[in-house]
Amino acid sequence: MFLILTCLLVGVGYWSTPAASGEKRIPVATSDEGKVPVGKLKPGDASPEFMAVDSNRRLVSLKDFKGKYVYVDLWATWCSPCVGQIPHLQRLEKLFKGKKIVFVSISCDEDVDEWLGYLRKNKMEGVQLNFDCNRRFQDAYGVKAIPRFILLDKKGRVVNPNMTRPSDPETEKTLNALKGI
């Protein structure tokens, strides 16, 4: 009986881990450098500034999106749950085209050339950035696994640090309800 109970508990523990559910853990360390408490961003807080490389190898800043809502998608090419959200994200991008919202996909891929190849091969458009999951950004948002979605307002403040996935019908409803979109 003890052996059966032990096996059951170990099995439940394994299947509830991110690896078993298809999520990839990102190593996150606490940060002394940030002005934002680690993992404490909440609605209304200013998002930490970030800079990342776009698909044309130019630096892009959060400031570049001022005046628009920003739906951030943290993903990687090796993350199957992330890749599974891409068609849903593309549908939202088309649905909200011309509105005051930008969909920003930030890749955590370490190999920029591999990431660029993936973008070309899959004809991915829109704002595509890569910054190998910048630690300050991870720390500020408490990012421990991807995919992860974040919604910012037109002034770069956090609306939802744990936004719903593009595949969730609530996402479209939430975006439609944004003031001045």
Question: Where on the chain are the PLM-derived regions?
Answer:
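Conserved redox-active cysteine motifs that mediate thiol-disulfide chemistry
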Residues: 67, 74-91
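A short beta-strand-turn-helix
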Residues: 50-70
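N-proximal helix/coil linker or "cap" segments that precede and/or mark the start of modular domains
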Residues: 13-49, 63, 117-120
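Bacterial N-terminal signal peptides
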Residues: 3-11
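Structural microenvironment flanking redox-active thiols in thiol-disulfide oxidoreductases
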Residues: 84-122, 133-139
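Short, internal strand/loop/helix patches
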Residues: 53, 116-155
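Thiol-/selenol-based redox modules, centered on thioredoxin-like
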Residues: 151-181
